[in-house]
Regions:
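Terminal domain-start segments
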Residues: 17-60
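Blade-terminus and WD-like Trp-Asp/Gly-His loop motifs, strongest in beta-propeller folds
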Residues: 27-35, 67-74, 131-140
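Structural core positions within WD40/WD-like beta-propeller blades
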Residues: 36-39, 75-78, 143
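Short, solvent-exposed loop/turn segments at conserved positions within beta-propeller repeat blades
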Residues: 40-43, 87-93
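Short coil/turn segments at the loop-to-beta-strand junctions that recur within blades
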Residues: 61-66, 113-116
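Short glycine/acidic-enriched loop and turn motifs that connect beta-strands
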Residues: 82-87, 149-150
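Beta-propeller blade signature
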Residues: 92-103
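Surface-exposed loop and turn segments in beta-propeller and other repeat-based domains
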Residues: 107-127
Length: 164
Protein backbone atom coordinates (compact mmCIF):
# COMPACT_ATOMS: atom_id res chain seq x y z
CA UNK A 1 0.00 0.00 0.00
CA UNK A 2 2.82 2.40 0.91
CA UNK A 3 4.44 1.80 -2.52
CA UNK A 4 1.14 2.58 -4.25
CA UNK A 5 0.80 5.88 -2.36
CA UNK A 6 4.42 6.80 -3.22
CA UNK A 7 3.82 6.10 -6.92
CA UNK A 8 0.57 8.12 -6.90
CA UNK A 9 2.27 11.12 -5.28
CA UNK A 10 5.22 10.95 -7.68
CA UNK A 11 2.92 10.85 -10.70
CA UNK A 12 0.76 13.74 -9.46
CA UNK A 13 3.82 15.94 -8.77
CA UNK A 14 5.25 15.24 -12.24
CA UNK A 15 1.89 15.90 -13.93
CA UNK A 16 1.54 19.20 -12.07
CA UNK A 17 5.09 20.21 -13.04
CA UNK A 18 4.52 19.31 -16.71
CA UNK A 19 1.47 21.57 -16.88
CA UNK A 20 3.31 24.63 -15.59
CA UNK A 21 4.49 27.30 -18.02
CA UNK A 22 8.17 27.39 -18.85
CA UNK A 23 10.28 29.86 -16.88
CA UNK A 24 11.24 33.01 -18.73
CA UNK A 25 14.80 32.51 -20.02
CA UNK A 26 17.40 35.20 -20.51
CA UNK A 27 17.85 35.77 -24.24
CA UNK A 28 20.91 37.12 -26.09
CA UNK A 29 20.83 37.86 -29.83
CA UNK A 30 23.77 39.26 -31.83
CA UNK A 31 23.44 41.52 -34.86
CA UNK A 32 24.51 40.09 -38.25
CA UNK A 33 28.12 41.32 -37.85
CA UNK A 34 28.24 40.71 -34.11
CA UNK A 35 28.99 44.41 -33.38
CA UNK A 36 25.86 44.84 -31.29
CA UNK A 37 23.72 42.49 -29.26
CA UNK A 38 20.31 42.54 -27.65
CA UNK A 39 19.88 41.04 -24.21
CA UNK A 40 16.49 40.32 -22.69
CA UNK A 41 16.46 39.27 -19.05
CA UNK A 42 13.27 38.56 -17.07
CA UNK A 43 14.59 40.48 -14.05
CA UNK A 44 16.63 43.27 -15.66
CA UNK A 45 14.55 43.97 -18.80
CA UNK A 46 15.89 44.32 -22.33
CA UNK A 47 18.81 46.33 -23.62
CA UNK A 48 21.04 46.78 -26.66
CA UNK A 49 24.80 46.76 -26.11
CA UNK A 50 27.98 47.45 -28.03
CA UNK A 51 29.35 43.88 -27.98
CA UNK A 52 33.06 44.82 -27.83
CA UNK A 53 32.84 47.44 -25.11
CA UNK A 54 29.91 45.85 -23.22
CA UNK A 55 28.40 49.33 -23.17
CA UNK A 56 24.62 49.68 -22.96
CA UNK A 57 23.43 51.77 -25.90
CA UNK A 58 19.76 51.86 -24.91
CA UNK A 59 17.07 49.82 -23.20
CA UNK A 60 13.44 48.96 -23.69
CA UNK A 61 10.75 47.95 -21.23
CA UNK A 62 10.00 44.37 -20.29
CA UNK A 63 11.25 40.95 -21.24
CA UNK A 64 11.01 39.68 -24.83
CA UNK A 65 11.19 36.02 -25.82
CA UNK A 66 12.36 36.78 -29.36
CA UNK A 67 14.22 39.88 -30.51
CA UNK A 68 16.46 40.83 -33.43
CA UNK A 69 18.99 43.68 -33.46
CA UNK A 70 20.45 45.50 -36.46
CA UNK A 71 24.16 46.21 -36.96
CA UNK A 72 23.61 49.97 -36.50
CA UNK A 73 22.70 49.36 -32.83
CA UNK A 74 19.76 51.74 -33.21
CA UNK A 75 17.07 49.37 -34.48
CA UNK A 76 15.51 46.29 -32.94
CA UNK A 77 12.48 44.11 -33.68
CA UNK A 78 10.58 42.13 -31.08
CA UNK A 79 8.39 39.19 -32.02
CA UNK A 80 5.10 38.04 -30.48
CA UNK A 81 5.92 35.88 -27.43
CA UNK A 82 4.03 32.93 -28.89
CA UNK A 83 6.66 32.95 -31.67
CA UNK A 84 5.25 31.24 -34.77
CA UNK A 85 2.05 29.99 -33.10
CA UNK A 86 -1.14 31.99 -32.64
CA UNK A 87 -4.09 31.09 -30.42
CA UNK A 88 -7.14 29.75 -32.24
CA UNK A 89 -9.20 32.60 -30.77
CA UNK A 90 -6.81 35.18 -32.23
CA UNK A 91 -7.58 38.85 -32.58
CA UNK A 92 -6.66 40.84 -35.68
CA UNK A 93 -5.19 43.42 -33.27
CA UNK A 94 -2.55 41.00 -31.93
CA UNK A 95 0.95 42.42 -32.54
CA UNK A 96 3.22 40.00 -34.43
CA UNK A 97 6.23 42.32 -34.80
CA UNK A 98 7.19 45.54 -33.01
CA UNK A 99 9.85 47.85 -34.46
CA UNK A 100 12.00 49.88 -32.06
CA UNK A 101 14.43 52.77 -32.53
CA UNK A 102 16.72 53.54 -29.59
CA UNK A 103 14.21 52.44 -26.97
CA UNK A 104 11.05 53.82 -28.57
CA UNK A 105 8.54 51.68 -30.36
CA UNK A 106 7.63 53.28 -33.68
CA UNK A 107 5.64 50.63 -35.54
CA UNK A 108 3.56 47.54 -34.84
CA UNK A 109 2.73 44.91 -37.45
CA UNK A 110 -0.54 43.30 -36.43
CA UNK A 111 -2.29 40.14 -37.60
CA UNK A 112 -4.60 42.25 -39.81
CA UNK A 113 -1.56 43.88 -41.49
CA UNK A 114 0.35 40.68 -42.26
CA UNK A 115 -2.38 38.06 -42.55
CA UNK A 116 -5.23 39.74 -44.44
CA UNK A 117 -6.85 36.35 -45.04
CA UNK A 118 -6.93 33.83 -42.19
CA UNK A 119 -6.92 31.07 -44.82
CA UNK A 120 -3.13 31.68 -44.92
CA UNK A 121 -2.82 30.23 -41.41
CA UNK A 122 -1.93 26.57 -40.94
CA UNK A 123 -3.89 24.79 -38.24
CA UNK A 124 -1.87 22.76 -35.73
CA UNK A 125 -3.42 20.59 -33.03
CA UNK A 126 -3.90 23.52 -30.62
CA UNK A 127 -2.85 26.69 -32.49
CA UNK A 128 -2.35 28.36 -35.86
CA UNK A 129 1.10 28.55 -37.45
CA UNK A 130 1.49 32.01 -39.02
CA UNK A 131 5.12 32.05 -40.22
CA UNK A 132 8.79 32.17 -39.31
CA UNK A 133 11.00 35.17 -38.52
CA UNK A 134 14.44 34.36 -39.93
CA UNK A 135 16.27 37.43 -38.60
CA UNK A 136 17.92 40.64 -39.74
CA UNK A 137 20.39 40.56 -42.62
CA UNK A 138 23.50 42.73 -43.13
CA UNK A 139 21.40 45.28 -45.08
CA UNK A 140 19.12 45.88 -42.09
CA UNK A 141 16.16 43.91 -43.42
CA UNK A 142 14.10 41.52 -41.32
CA UNK A 143 13.23 38.39 -43.29
CA UNK A 144 9.84 36.89 -42.49
CA UNK A 145 8.35 33.84 -44.18
CA UNK A 146 4.57 33.62 -43.99
CA UNK A 147 2.84 30.23 -43.54
CA UNK A 148 1.86 30.23 -47.22
CA UNK A 149 5.57 30.32 -48.19
CA UNK A 150 5.63 33.99 -49.25
CA UNK A 151 8.76 35.85 -48.08
CA UNK A 152 8.81 39.45 -46.87
CA UNK A 153 11.71 41.80 -46.15
CA UNK A 154 11.05 44.61 -43.67
CA UNK A 155 13.40 47.60 -43.59
CA UNK A 156 13.99 47.81 -39.83
CA UNK A 157 14.63 51.58 -39.97
CA UNK A 158 11.04 52.24 -41.12
CA UNK A 159 9.22 49.03 -40.16
CA UNK A 160 7.79 48.49 -43.63
CA UNK A 161 8.29 45.92 -46.36
CA UNK A 162 10.86 46.62 -49.03
CA UNK A 163 11.91 45.00 -52.29
CA UNK A 164 14.67 42.38 -52.19
Amino acid sequence: MRALVTVAITISVNVARADMPLPLPANVRASPSGRTRAISDPKAGARVEDAKRHKVLWSLPGWHRSLFVADDGKHLVTQYDGLNLLPTHLSDDLVLLAFWREGRKFRDVRVRDFLPDHQILERTVTHYHWGIVHGIDAQGRLKVERADGKNFLFDVSIGKTTEA
